[in-house]
UniProtKB/Swiss-Prot annotation:
Catalytic residues identified in the record: 113 (nucleophile), 268, 296 (proton donor)
Keyword Protease belongs to the record: yes
Stated name of the protein: Proline iminopeptidase
GO cellular component, one term: cytoplasm
Annotated organism of origin: Serratia marcescens
Catalytic reaction equation(s): Release of N-terminal proline from a peptide
Keywords recorded for this protein, A-Z: Aminopeptidase, Cytoplasm, Hydrolase, Protease
One protein family per Pfam: Abhydrolase_1
Subunit structure as annotated in this protein's UniProt entry: Monomer.
Length: 317
């Protein structure tokens, strides 16, 4: 039986800083690995999730030069939890600014969950800048998928956890959970915001792995939850600021020439495996791996194994 791959050993960033976007945001970025290695950009999830030192370990440090960054309003980027000038297209422009700052012509784009959404939006806008793509836990931000996770679908698998999400809502508000939480997450009362943020964030933290994870507790930490919930709800309220429900699938022909690996857990409750299947049907050149016995998170054993194989293989080019 094949031994499952794990992360590369921990490593420090060799450079870091903040990029001033010119419209009120400062984006935290860092570079790790080999300064002369193959360029890659890591796009985190959420939106609002931020980067972790573990994310550096997805890439061979001897063969990759990896740029990681906290998207607007989250992680170490400032202002914290800000929704102003914070849309998908602002983030696409930020990635281009970071590419130019790093002196990179083309790079591998790695994104999971919301990171796969943003990776697709970026690649479809700037296909000439993308050498390869590694996508995990596919999320194309269609209304039906939001309804599954925030209204009626995943709730049937986690009824006791969903009950906590509904606990602060009236019967009438429960008809549109995203809208009801929008009211609270943009309230003038910081305590109302924080209460809603923690419930929203913990719901995701407790449902993204097939088996319970100790790391889900971090989703309830005040600073993380506030940015995560406010930004995520903001994007979902506006349907990702996309032109249409099928924009990312419709525009796949723009990127079909880019080598790509798609990895998705069979029992992903946050982003159904149908998302990956639909993307792969639109993109037959892409390599699809549906991982049995796995949920949504990148660090579940079978998912991580496929991601590591993909980054190693692309580094060999």
């Amino acid at each position: 039986m094949e031994q499952l791959r794990g992360l590369y050993p921990p490593l420090a960033a060799y450079d870091s800083g903040w990029l001033d976007t010119g419209d009120g945001h400062r984006i935290y970025w860092e570079l790790s690995g080999n300064p002369n290695g193959k360029p890659a950009v890591f796009i985190h999830g959420g939106p609002g999730g931020g980067i972790s030192p573990h994310h550096r370990q997805l890439f061979d440090p001897e063969r990759y030069k990896v740029l990681l960054f906290d998207q607007r309003g989250c992680g170490r980027s400032r202002p914290h939890a800000s929704l102003d000038n914070n849309t998908t297209w602002h983030l696409v422009a930020d990635i281009e600014r970071l590419r130019e700052m790093a002196g990179v012509e083309q790079w591998l784009v790695f994104g999971g969950s919301w990171g796969s959404t943003l990776a697709l939006a970026y690649a479809q806008t700037h296909p000439e800048r993308v050498s390869e793509m590694v996508l995990r836990g596919i999320f194309t931000l269609r209304k039906q998928r939001l309804h599954w996770y925030y209204q009626d679908g995943a709730s049937r698998f986690f009824p006791e956890k969903w009950e906590r999400v509904l606990s602060i809502l009236s019967d009438d508000e429960r008809k549109d959970v995203i809208a009801a939480y929008r009211q609270r997450l943009t309230s003038a009362d910081p305590q109302v915001q924080l209460e809603a943020a923690k419930l929203w964030s913990v719901w995701e933290g407790e449902t993204v792995t097939l088996l319970p994870s100790r790391e889900s507790a971090s989703f309830g930490e005040d600073d993380f939850a506030l940015a995560f919930a406010r930004i995520e709800n903001h994007y979902f309220t506006h349907l990702g600021f996309l032109e249409s429900d099928d924009q990312l699938l419709r525009n796949v022909p723009l990127i079909r020439h880019i080598p790509a690996v798609i990895v998705h857990g069979r029992y992903d409750m946050a982003c159904q495996v149908q998302n990956a299947w639909d993307l792969a049907k639109a993109w037959p050149e892409a390599e699809l791996h549906i991982v049995e016995g796995a949920g949504h998170s990148y660090d579940e054993p079978g998912i991580l194994h496929q991601l590591m194989i993909a980054t190693d293989r692309f580094a060999g080019k």
